[in-house]
Amino acid sequence: MSLDITLYEYGPSRSKQARWALLECGLEFKSVSGIGILHSEELIKVNPMGKVPAVVINGEPLFEAAAICTYLADLAPEKGLIAPSGSRERALHLQWVSFALTEMEAYLWSNARNTFVLPKEQRISALIEQNNAAFLHAASVLEKVLAENDYLVGQRFSVTDILVGFTLNWGKGAKLLETFPNLQKYLERLKQRPHCTL
């Protein structure tokens, strides 16, 4: 099947996940990038929120990094980046991606909003401490899992690691992984991959 793929992306954002997945899948794509694309009329036609990442694949729009990366992996089954639908490993993919988004990334994003995204008068600095505590609790769960496993699903690299790895790398940048040696080793493994965008 011939694929016509356009990726809407901008530097330090979740669009790194989509780019990494495209590269791992070996799929050719066009890039529309730069800060000027954010909230533009062109991007809003693809993602009504005007945010990246977003893709158009054979004329069909799709947004949200987890959806994009999962779909891309399904489009390149020969790469073995995701288990078949209906398998336990596919359920584990959904489990860990949902876990990272709800139990970790949501708190990192709240910290960002209340540190530099929102205007000063709208920031709630009291949230930072409780957000960090929630993130650290979730990180302790992954620390135990990765003490016994090199990767999150099926003992091999998968699109799950692209999505969760991005969140953990964000946490590392916020200095929240300093007491988690297994998470740090996991990130180093991911960064060894030639297509890694972390």
Question: Where do the protein language model's features map onto the residues?
Answer:
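GST-like fold's C-terminal all-alpha helical module
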Residues: 100-189
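Residue-level recognition of oxygen-bearing side chains
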Residues: 67, 182, 195
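GST-like domain detector, emphasizing the conserved glutathione-binding G-site
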Residues: 1-126
